[in-house]
Structures are given as C-alpha cells and as structure tokens.
C-alpha cells in the first residue's frame, strides 16, 4: 500500500498537490519556445539612478507629462487673514511641529527657562530704597540740630546786650573760633575713614557746629536786629524752596559740579578784590553772586543726598551730607545779611 507524501521534500521542484485546504495561486509556467532554449526573461526595468554596468532598455511605459486637468493650475488664493512668511529651512527639512499651547507659538520665542534671580531684584530695590530713606531722615535730623544751635546762638548774640557788647570788644575770639572751624572742616572733608567712624565723627561735627555758630552770631551782632531777622526769614524761604525744587525737578544739578567749582575760584578772586577796593556797590554785587552760587550748591548737595541723579552720596556719609547742607545754608544767610546790611547803610 502506497502513501502519497503530503509534505515538501528537499529537492522537489513543486509542492504536493493533495494538500488539504485552499491552495495559493501559482504563477503561470513559462514554457520555452523550443526544447533546449532558455527561459524568456522579463523585460528589464531601467534603474532610476543610472548605475553603470547594467544595460538600459526602453521603459515599458510611455514617459511624458501628466495631462492638463480641467481646472487651471495656479497658486492658492489668499485667505482672509494675512499669512506671515516663514524663513526657509536651509537643510530642506520640514519645520518642527509647534504646539499652539506652547509659549513658543507665534512670533514669541523664549530664549531659555525663566530666571528666578529676576524675582530677587524687587526685594533688593526695596531694601536700597529703605536704606536711602533712613539715610535722608538721619541727615535732616542732624541738620535740624545744627541749625537749631546756630539760630539760638544768633538770637543770643542779637537780643542780649551784654553778650553783644562782649563779642564786639573781644574780636580775637572770632579768630580762635575760625581756626577751630577750619581744622574740623579739613578733618571731616579730607579724612573719609574718620568721618565714618562713630562717635568721633559726631564729636568733630559738634565742634564744627559750635565754632561756626559762634562766628555767625558774632557777625550778626554787628548788624541791627531788623536786618538779622529779615536775613533769617529770607534764608529760610530760599532754602526751603530750593530743597523742594531739587526733589521734584528732573534736571540733574550734579552734572554742573565742575562749573560750580570754577565759579568758587572766581568768587574767591572777587573777594580779594573787594578787600582792597572798599565800595558798597561792589560788596553788594559780590554778596549777590555768593548767595546765588551757594544756592546752586544747595541744590547739588540736595540731589547728592537723594541719590536719584548721576552722582550720589553713600548712606554711610550722613555726617558729610549734613556738613555740606549746613555750610551751604550758613553761607546763604551770611551773604543775604551782607546784602541787607549794605543796602540799609
């Protein structure tokens, strides 16, 4: 009894024909035209890349353009919204996909992750502002004490006859107080470490205030009471106006520091001229220029105190700031007193 094989044996040309189930379609068998002839080859397809060493035959399909459609070809019509041009990709790659909800959608492009150091600027700004405000309050407190001492000394030397007579008879006390004032002024102006060292800076400032108050009171004792009172009132009005104006204006007076220093040299030469030429009109002109110059210095020193312009003082220099404002106000008072006194003669 013979059994037909139902599996493929190595060396067989064709699979068995009695396999159970549907059989896969077989390709048509190509017969040779005559015994011994080779099997016909399929037509050669030309290589699209034109490789050398392979024969190139004619393509079985006619080459040519696509037929023209019934609609005219052209660009797409412009939409109702203007389209923003995109720069071409230099490498011919398609543009990356952008999520409409991402922060880089549209023309906005974020360079990097948000910096948390930016949020720390606000406490620093508030901290600097608080320090500057405390510095301003301290300076005006010291200045108020200085002016109170000077005003009290001027009032005593003006309204008390015994004191007025004593200082008029003892002129040498003026030169002693001037020497003490000059030494303390040089120390506070030139020695930065000393004027920042507490409490010696306040001690030196107190010595300067007392000596200058004595000088101002002695000068005021040579004028009548009415002239002194008028000078005090005018000085108060001028200084208050200049300080308020310096706080509100946008003009930077600190940029004029060089011009003011040159003006001080010119005023000093003018003062030497007035010593040798005793003329009432010339002295009034000199006093007017001096009052105007130190009014400008008061504006500059006020803006240096505020710290909102090109130049500013360090919060550690509250003694130096008070010294500048105090000497400006005293010089304005003395020049105005000279103008009023010479005008009444």
Swiss-Prot record:
Annotated organism of origin: Mus musculus (Mouse)
Protein's name according to its UniProt entry: Protein lifeguard 1
Keyword DNA damage included in the entry's annotation: no
Listed Pro residues bias regions: 24-46, 79-98
Topology term for the membrane: Multi-pass membrane protein
GO molecular function: transmembrane transporter binding
Function text: Potential apoptotic regulator.
Subcellular location: Membrane
Gene that produces this protein: Grina
